[in-house]
């Protein structure tokens, strides 16, 4: 299984705060930002480096820089936007691509309604961000879109995942690693992660789930 559960104490502490049932919109946004940054740190841990020579204060000096491919961050709309700034804290030069999907509440299948990708995806590392990986349908659809556009290096960053969704993603795209703060118990009959976080999109945007 191509899955990394990040067990860092700060990650687990912040995840626990997000699980509070009566959490305010402001607090949920703030902690989502912080957690996204920590998860992105883990997801970029093995980026390849190369030495370059620069003019330092005392003359020429050799330093390390990220080698080769540049990053595009791909939030899945709308909830993925809540994680965007946290990831950009670490990779501020990253270009942003977006994918718009919503879940059909009857079939639980993803329905695409918008996408906009940066150029030269074949030369980039894509970091897909979405707070919840539930059924896996939206993540698989997003990976499908990226691969059709030529992207060969893709990673997924989610705050909470369900075993059912991880299984779907791994079966469809075993080459795509998933980074999460928690692999939760299961999905309920409505396709929500248990114990999960509730509706992350509604909590980030301050809207009510109908």
From Swiss-Prot:
Binds 1 Mg(2+) ion per subunit. The magnesium is bound as Mg-PRPP. Pathway: Pyrimidine metabolism; UMP biosynthesis via salvage pathway; UMP from uracil: step 1/1. Its EC number is 2.4.2.9. One of its GO terms (molecular function) is magnesium ion binding. CDD domains: PRTases_typeI. The keyword GTP-binding applies. Uracil binds at residues 193, 198-200. Keywords: Allosteric enzyme, Glycosyltransferase, GTP-binding, Magnesium, Nucleotide-binding, Transferase. Catalyzes the conversion of uracil and 5-phospho-alpha-D-ribose 1-diphosphate (PRPP) to UMP and diphosphate. Belongs to the UPRTase family. This is Uracil phosphoribosyltransferase. It comes from Laribacter hongkongensis (strain HLHK9).
């Amino acid at each position: 299984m191509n899955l990394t559960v990040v067990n860092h104490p700060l990650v687990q502490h912040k995840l626990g705060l997000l699980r509070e049932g009566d959490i305010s919109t402001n607090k949920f946004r703030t902690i989502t930002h912080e957690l996204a940054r920590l998860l992105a740190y883990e997801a970029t841990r093995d980026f390849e480096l190369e030495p370059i020579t620069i003019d330092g204060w005392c003359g020429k000096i050799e330093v390390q820089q990220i080698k080769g491919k540049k990053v595009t961050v791909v939030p899945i709309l709308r909830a993925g936007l809540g994680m965007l700034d946290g990831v950009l804290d670490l990779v501020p030069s990253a270009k942003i691509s977006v994918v718009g999907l919503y879940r059909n509440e009857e079939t639980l299948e993803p329905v695409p309604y918008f996408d906009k990708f940066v150029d030269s995806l074949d030369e980039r590392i894509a970091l897909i961000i979405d707070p919840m990986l539930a059924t896996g349908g939206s993540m698989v659809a997003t990976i499908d879109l990226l691969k059709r556009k030529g992207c060969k290096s893709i990673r997924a960053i989610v705050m909470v995942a369900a075993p059912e969704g991880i299984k779907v993603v791994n079966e469809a795209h075993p080459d795509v690693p998933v980074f999460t703060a928690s692999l939760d118990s299961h999905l309920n009959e409505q396709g929500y992660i248990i114990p999960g976080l509730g509706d992350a999109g509604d909590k980030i945007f301050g809207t009510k789930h109908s």
